[in-house]
């Protein structure tokens, strides 16, 4: 699966960005739980999820800054 670029994420609506952020935070929680119970097989999903979450949070903060000015 190809990673979405920042320009792809900037085209999402505010509601979609917020929804994806919530989903990724939930996914990271579940991954940490699986890791603690030794049920996690794909450890690379941590990195992918954290990276996408950081990109989405960056897009969200850019929008907040541009709306404030």
UniProtKB/Swiss-Prot annotation:
InterPro entries (UniProt xref): Ribosomal_protein_uL29 (IPR050063), Ribosomal_uL29 (IPR001854), Ribosomal_uL29_sf (IPR036049)
Gene Ontology terms: cellular component: cytosolic large ribosomal subunit
BP term (GO), one: translation
Transmembrane segments: none
GO terms of molecular function: structural constituent of ribosome
The keyword Acetylation belongs to this UniProt entry's keyword annotation: no
Cited SUPFAM superfamilies: Ribosomal protein L29 (L29p) (SSF46561)
Keyword Ribosomal protein recorded: yes
Gene3D superfamilies: 1.10.287.310
Pfam families in the cross-refs: Ribosomal_L29 (PF00831)
Keywords, sorted A to Z: Ribonucleoprotein, Ribosomal protein
Family under the similarity heading: Belongs to the universal ribosomal protein uL29 family.
The protein's name: Large ribosomal subunit protein uL29
Organism: Synechococcus sp. (strain CC9311)
Gene assigned in the entry: rpmC
């Amino acid at each position: 699966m190809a990673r979405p670029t920042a320009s792809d994420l900037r085209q999402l609506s505010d509601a979609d960005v917020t929804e994806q952020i919530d989903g990724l935070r939930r996914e990271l929680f579940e991954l940490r739980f699986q890791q603690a119970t030794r049920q996690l097989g794909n450890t690379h999903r941590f990195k992918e999820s954290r990276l996408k979450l950081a990109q989405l949070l960056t897009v969200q903060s850019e929008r907040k800054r541009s709306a404030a000015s």
